[in-house]
Amino acid sequence: CQGTYRGDVTGSQKKYGFLMQAENPDCDTVELYEAPIDAMSGATLRQYTDIGKWRSVHYLALGGLNYLPIDYFLQQHPQVKNVVLCFDRDEPGLRFAETVAQRLAERGCNVEKRLPAVGKDYNESLIWYKSKIEKQRGERV
């Protein structure tokens, strides 16, 4: 049975995001996402689109539009200077990206904003991309 609960468990600490660490512990790049499903989708898209090895960067999901995990992560990973904002393509996500970009630039980080290519978020982009690949494979048969 799949549940539909989406929320925080009582007592959870918002400074801890969902982190998939890069293979190289000295990696200087992190991609920030709103939700774990989007971070996992971003990693999968990296594999599909041949951008590079999926573990070549850190992936951090913030658990919503929350700056605390960013601050905590950067404290724990002082070598990270390149931050890619992969937030949802909606008004709250776009506004948060502006705020985060400014704060990170003030910290001396290089910031890139990368909207999902298709759909509202990276999971929707992955679903679209996978259906495109499956359709192409079906046409070749």
Where are each of the predicted segments found?
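Basic, glycine-enriched DNA-binding surface that flanks or lies within the catalytic cores of DNA
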Residues: 1-23
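Conserved phosphate-coordination/catalytic loops
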Residues: 10, 33, 64
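A short, charged/proline- and glycine-enriched loop
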Residues: 24-30
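TOPRIM fold recognition
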Residues: 28, 44-141
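Helix N-cap/beta->alpha junction signal
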Residues: 34-37, 89
